[in-house]
């Protein structure tokens, strides 16, 4: 995310679609400890290696881990994809120290792409992408699908909101494309009209 040891002062927005859970979490944890602010969007599209049935069995085994005398004391079993990812990152950070707690506070996680971040350029992390890290033909499942199987009730709502967001983004993109075409056309017309005068205007960057 950050080149070398330099830290980007701005908040980095990462599109988690088709990233591997563990690899994305480890890279994110490292950047948080280095002082980088990170926002992870579309957590429901994160990939887990292994089929859905296997991952669901693993999660059900995890659900059985509880405090016998008072289960509400923990461990807490998150169902939402964003909270599952947050907990994975927390496990890679010394979150009970001041440094670790400050690092974890720099992380924000969301399902879908909420309004402040839908207009910000999002990045991907090649070292965590499924297409580069998982063998072709290897089974995988999406975190959102797993969450919906174990008690998360907003899978369909997020899918609907994402469809609407993509439609709005497509309209904006088409409008931008038309404006670019008009600008290029206007520049050509201006060049034809100005002709030799361009040689005078170019050195002064007019």
From Swiss-Prot:
Domain of life the protein comes from: Eukaryota
InterPro entries (alphabetical): Ribosomal_uL13 (IPR005822), Ribosomal_uL13_CS (IPR023563), Ribosomal_uL13_euk/arc (IPR005755), Ribosomal_uL13_sf (IPR036899)
SUPFAM superfamilies according to UniProt: Ribosomal protein L13
GO cellular component labels: cytosolic large ribosomal subunit; cytosolic ribosome; plastid
Keyword flag Nucleotide-binding: no
Any one biological process term the GO annotation gives: translation
CDD domains, alphabetized: Ribosomal_L13
A matching Pfam family: Ribosomal_L13
GO molecular function, one term: mRNA binding
Swiss-Prot/TrEMBL keywords: Ribonucleoprotein, Ribosomal protein
Similarity-based family: Belongs to the universal ribosomal protein uL13 family.
Listed name of the protein: Large ribosomal subunit protein uL13w
Organism: Arabidopsis thaliana (Mouse-ear cress)
Gene name of the record: RPL13AD
């Amino acid at each position: 995310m950050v080149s070398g040891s330099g830290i980007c002062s701005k908040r980095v927005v990462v599109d988690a679609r088709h990233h591997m859970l563990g690899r994305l979490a480890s890279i994110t944890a490292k950047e948080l400890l280095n002082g980088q602010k990170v926002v992870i969007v579309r957590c429901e599209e994160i990939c887990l290696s292994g089929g859905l049935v296997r991952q669901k069995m693993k999660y059900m085994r995890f659900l059985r881990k509880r405090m016998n005398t008072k289960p509400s004391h923990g461990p807490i079993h998150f169902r939402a994809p964003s909270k599952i990812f947050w907990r994975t990152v927390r496990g890679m950070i010394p979150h009970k120290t001041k440094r670790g707690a400050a690092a974890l506070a720099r992380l924000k996680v969301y399902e879908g792409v909420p309004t402040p971040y839908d207009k910000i350029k999002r990045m991907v992390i090649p070292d965590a992408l499924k297409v580069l890290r998982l063998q072709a033909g290897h089974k995988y499942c999406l975190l959102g699908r797993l969450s919906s199987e174990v008690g998360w009730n907003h899978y369909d709502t997020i899918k609907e909101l994402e469809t609407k967001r993509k439609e709005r983004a497509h309209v904006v993109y088409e409008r931008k494309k038309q404006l670019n075409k008009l600008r290029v056309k206007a520049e050509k017309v201006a060049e034809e009209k100005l002709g030799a005068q361009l040689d005078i205007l170019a050195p002064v960057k007019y």
